[in-house]
Amino acid sequence: MTTTTASATFPLRLVDGRRLERRYRDVLLPGGVLVDNQGQARVLPRYFYEVVSWEQASDTYLAPHFAVSEFIHTDVREAPPLRVFPRYIPCATALLALALEQFREAVGSYVYIGANGGYCSPRHARTGGASPHCWGTAANIYRVGDTYLDSHETIAKYAAIAREVLPTVWTRPLGPESWKTDDHLHMDLGYVVSVPREAPGETYNLKLAGDPL
């Protein structure tokens, strides 16, 4: 497995998902493709941060008020290899944490992410199509401060704040249908893939890659 050394300020190792053991590759599908509900192919993340324990997840912050642990709450619907440590999160989860930090500042209170409301692997039982949760760029927020987001009024209120603070964020429409929401605020950054500078990458070969033009 190819990794880079964790820095003094950020303890999680960067991992090339394509070089992980087969059991992890089969559930993370690094660099693979999922198809969204419009029939568009979306390329999955290739690079991940490795989380070796719950203690490390709780002690490592991606933003001043958001620890890694808040993005990896799962239940038995997650694929078995990702129910135990080590766990892997897409690098773009750090971008989501920064967006949530801005949202938290705007609402002036705590923001709570639900179980299975952060990163979910492509093999999670409830993953349907190309969910941004598989990119680590979506969060399901069930509570802000002392307010539970279990009504159209509260969800709409905080969705409007999210869109005002983060103009490019997407919030799920309200309603009882499966593709809508009525008991939490879903916000996501889309299909963002983050490749840190220290990622090894590959030498580009036009003959092998094909001329895109």
Describe each PLM feature range.
Residues 3-13, 129-213:
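Catalytic cores and adjacent binding grooves of peptidoglycan-active enzymes
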Residues 85-88, 110-116, 156-163:
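N-terminal start-of-chain detector that recognizes signal peptides
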Residues 95-128:
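Extended, low-complexity, intrinsically disordered C-terminal regulatory tails
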Residues 50-51, 58, 64, 122, ...:
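A broad, structure-centric signal for solvent-exposed, well-ordered loop/edge residues
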Residues 47-107:
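Active-site acidic/histidine clusters and adjacent loop/turn architecture
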Residues 29, 52-54, 124, 163, ...:
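Short linear sequence elements within intrinsically disordered, low-complexity coil regions
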Residues 1-49, 205-213:
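N-terminal secretory targeting signals
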